[in-house]
Design a protein with these regions (language model features):
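Sec/Tat-exported extracytoplasmic proteins
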Residues: 75, 79-87, 107-110, 168, ...
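Bacterial N-terminal signal peptides
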Residues: 8-16
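Surface-exposed short loop/turn segments
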Residues: 22-28, 86-136, 142-151
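A structural "domain/chain start" motif
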Residues: 16-73, 173-179
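Bacterial N-terminal signal peptides that target proteins for export
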Residues: 1-7
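A short, polar/charged loop/turn motif at coil->beta-strand junctions and beta-hairpin connectors
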Residues: 7, 39-41, 95
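Short secondary-structure boundary motifs at beta->alpha junctions and helix caps
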Residues: 58-71, 130-178
Length: 179
């Protein structure tokens, strides 16, 4: 009897973080205004599915916040929309080059911004441009989004994703490799 009781307590404690997690509906759409023109790139380009290397629930944004779908899918969508916004015509097969992404970490902090308590979400995503059987270019994008705490985790995630896109499309070396 004691063994059952102990196992039940361990089971409940082990799944308690999942029960207290807050689910966030993420309806991300890139609405930024980067001025990078990808319409004249000379190679066919594909974005591979983003991999999540954090080793936790794939829907985890950070701390106790879960998205309705895996964070890797949300980041994929952000990269796709950001490149399309610049006129890139992305392909699904027979590509000359592909972009591979890997989520390294996500961290949520509460910070003071000029007397305003704010949420700061940082998502680190390693991105590599592959072509001709090798890595041509790679970097780690630091998507840091900071918003007043009242705006919530959804707004912090949107700001973080916008920053991921800006860092990618404004990287001179990335742009050079696509020409």
């Amino acid at each position: 009897m004691k063994l059952r009781y102990v196992l039940a307590v361990i089971f409940c404690l082990g799944f308690n973080p999942l029960m207290s997690a807050e689910e966030v509906i993420v309806d991300y759409s890139y609405n930024g205004n980067h001025n990078t023109d990808f319409s004249s790139i000379s190679v066919s380009l594909k974005i591979e599915n983003v991999i999540d290397d954090r080793g936790s629930d794939p829907r985890l944004i950070a701390d106790e916040y879960l998205a309705e779908k895996p964070l890797s899918e949300i980041i994929y969508t952000a990269l796709f929309q950001g490149l399309e916004h610049g006129g890139a015509e992305l392909v699904t097969s027979d590509q000359d080059m592909q972009i591979q992404g890997r989520i390294v970490s996500s961290e949520l902090r509460t910070v003071d911004r000029s007397g305003v308590e704010s949420l700061q979400l940082t998502i680190r995503t390693q991105v590599a441009l592959q072509g001709r059987g090798r890595t041509i270019w790679e970097t780690t994008l630091f998507g840091r989004g900071t918003v007043p705490i009242e705006e919530g985790i959804g707004a912090a995630l949107t700001a973080s994703l916008d920053r991921v896109v800006r860092e990618l499309v404004n990287d001179d070396y990335f742009i050079i490799e696509l020409q």
